[in-house]
UniProtKB/Swiss-Prot annotation:
Organism ancestry: Bacteria, Bacillati, Bacillota, Bacilli, Lactobacillales
CDD domains reported for this sequence: GIY-YIG_UPF0213
Alphabetized Gene3D superfamilies for the sequence: GIY-YIG endonuclease (3.40.1440.10)
Membership in a protein family: Belongs to the UPF0213 family.
Superkingdom, taxonomy of origin: Bacteria
InterPro entries with a match to the protein in the record: GIY-YIG_endonuc, GIY-YIG_endonuc_sf, UPF0213_domain
Secretion signal span: none
Residue ranges of every copy of the GIY-YIG domain listed in the record: 15-92
SUPFAM superfamilies on file: GIY-YIG endonuclease
Organism expressing this protein natively: Lactiplantibacillus plantarum (strain ATCC BAA-793 / NCIMB 8826 / WCFS1) (Lactobacillus plantarum)
The protein, known as: UPF0213 protein lp_2058
Amino acid sequence: MASTSKPAASTTAIKKYYFYVLLCADQTLYGGFTDNLQRRLATHNAGKGAKYTRVRSRRPLQLIYHETFTDKSSALKAEYAFKHQSRAAKLKYLSAHDVKI
């Protein structure tokens, strides 16, 4: 007797990418990109992240905002756009997304 089996359900998770904003201890803002928010924040706070966040006076860093994307390109574009704004424009962007600093 032949056995019939159904194909296994796909367990492939959709990859997520994040654009995030950190508030530094010196009240400056840092925007970045990652595929793992918790790991990246821990790396920044350990002084092993981006050159900007390695400065001791900027730590600890606090995650104040993030956006989720299903493709890397969109997350990188969001990071690029944020980083090329003035501080006033960054604050306006965050305020429009209900982030209070």
